[in-house]
Curated annotation (Swiss-Prot):
UniProt name for this protein: Beta-hexosaminidase
Catalytic activity annotation: Hydrolysis of terminal non-reducing N-acetyl-D-hexosamine residues in N-acetyl-beta-D-hexosaminides
EC number(s) recorded for this UniProt protein: 3.2.1.52
GO biological process: carbohydrate metabolic process; cell division; cell wall organization; peptidoglycan biosynthetic process; peptidoglycan turnover; regulation of cell shape
UniProt pathway annotation: Cell wall biogenesis; peptidoglycan recycling
Family: Belongs to the glycosyl hydrolase 3 family. NagZ subfamily.
Superkingdom to which the source organism belongs: Bacteria
InterPro entries per the UniProt record, alphabetical: Beta_hexosaminidase_bac, Glyco_hydro_3_AS, Glyco_hydro_3_N, Glyco_hydro_3_N_sf, Glycoside_hydrolase_SF, NagZ_Beta-hexosaminidase
Stated role: Plays a role in peptidoglycan recycling by cleaving the terminal beta-1,4-linked N-acetylglucosamine (GlcNAc) from peptide-linked peptidoglycan fragments, giving rise to free GlcNAc, anhydro-N-acetylmuramic acid and anhydro-N-acetylmuramic acid-linked peptides.
Binding residue positions for substrate: 69, 77, 144, 174-175
Location in or out of the cell: Cytoplasm
Length: 361
């Protein structure tokens, strides 16, 4: 059977369960689609996951990019057979207790284990690290954040990024320009952050600026409004994405929208309008999660935006290690020692407050 050549489109979709249905195969063959995000509902065990990712990658060429939210703590989609990853705040606690060097070493090991284990199962990308500062205001961020100190966040994220690279994965910093100061959860409401741009510059924006300079591959903007900068949420804002992120900060990587089905995005209109505004604001790729009906609505008469960098940016997010090589790495004593070290950092407190961030069952 000939595998069809279909350039990757700018939409990332999802699926319902452990295997692809015929309807889902047809959806994923649509030229509008370029990637797929997996959730807990798609994971039964490691062998099933490998079968699923192989099935997805066999559909078309170039292969669909497969992503997951696999940060650690409350946001680790795959559990059985994977190393339990600590909440990122654990690395911040090491920073405070044992110093920057110890914390950076730990962050590098977490990134390496996280990426290698996912790579072994055919996953290209984890949407990590969280670059939000922990101001103590935002439960949906909370211990997903490394620290409140921008320098600590940037240095720990950079160390994690180096570990991800060893495991064959790129980084995706989120949620630009910072979700940690607001109280609301943008999955459920549209939060507002009333600080000025200068206040954001001295704190929340600093990790994004540093990580951009250090090769961060992708950014995901927040569904948060910053009224003193723009009346539109950051993910729908040309000011935030084209002027501040691209021009002022100089970010040259991929911009993924956050999920366009989140409540924080719904005020922009229907799914076609949300996608249009996202693309016009500067997003390269939009996520449409947990609503296959909206993916179908979006791809009906879909016109792929003029983005000459899209193919290159998609390919840049592809895994660079490969499943077989990652599985070989996992057999080494050095890697198994890293797994034991990382598992020792995790604790039941990491998931206090629930594991369902952004998840639908």
């Amino acid at each position: 059977m000939t595998v069809p050549h279909i350039p990757r489109g700018p939409v990332m979709a999802d699926i319902a369960a452990f295997r692809l249905t015929e309807e889902e195969k047809q959806r994923l063959l649509d030229p509008a689609v370029g990637g797929i995000i997996l959730f807990r509902r798609n994971f039964q065990n490691i062998e099933q996951l490998k079968t699923l990712t192989a099935e997805i990658k066999a559909l078309r060429t170039p292969e669909l990019i497969i992503a997951v939210d696999h940060e650690g703590g409350r946001v680790q989609r795959f559990i059985e057979g994977f190393t339990r990853l600590p909440a990122m705040s654990t690395l911040g606690e090491i920073w405070d207790k044992d110093g920057a060097s110890a914390a950076e070493t730990a962050a590098g090991q977490v990134g390496r284990v996280l990426a290698t284990e996912l790579s072994a199962c055919g996953i290209d990308l984890s949407f990590t690290p969280v670059l939000d500062l922990d101001w103590g205001n935002c439960p949906v961020i909370g211990n997903r954040s490394f620290h409140r100190n921008p320098e600590a966040v940037a240095r720990l994220a950079l160390a994690l990024q180096k570990g991800l690279t060893k495991g064959g994965m790129k980084s995706c910093g989120k949620h630009f320009p910072g979700h940690g100061f607001v109280e609301g959860d943008s999955h459920l409401v549209l939060p507002e952050d009333w600080r000025s741009l200068s206040e954001l510059e001295t704190a929340d924006l600093a990790p994004f600026r540093i990580m951009s300079r250090e090769g961060m591959a992708a950014v995901m903007p927040a569904h948060v409004v910053y009224p003193q900068v723009d009346t539109k949420p950051a993910g729908f804002s040309e000011i935030w994405l084209k002027q501040i992120l691209r021009r002022d900060i100089g970010f040259k990587g991929v911009i993924f929208s956050d999920d366009l089905t989140m409540e924080g995005a719904c005020g922009a209109g229907g799914i076609k309008e949300r996608a249009r505004i996202s693309f016009e604001a500067g997003c390269d790729i939009v996520l449409v999660c947990n609503r296959p009906d909206l993916v179908d609505e979006l791809r009906e008469d879909f016109r792929i935006p003029d983005n000459p960098t899209l193919a290159q940016r998609w390919q840049y997010m592809a895994n660079t290690l490969g499943s077989a090589a990652a599985q070989a790495v996992m057999q080494t004593a050095d890697f198994q020692a890293a797994q034991a070290f990382v598992a020792g950092l995790a604790s039941p407190q990491d998931t206090a407050g629930g594991v369902k961030v952004g998840e639908a069952f």
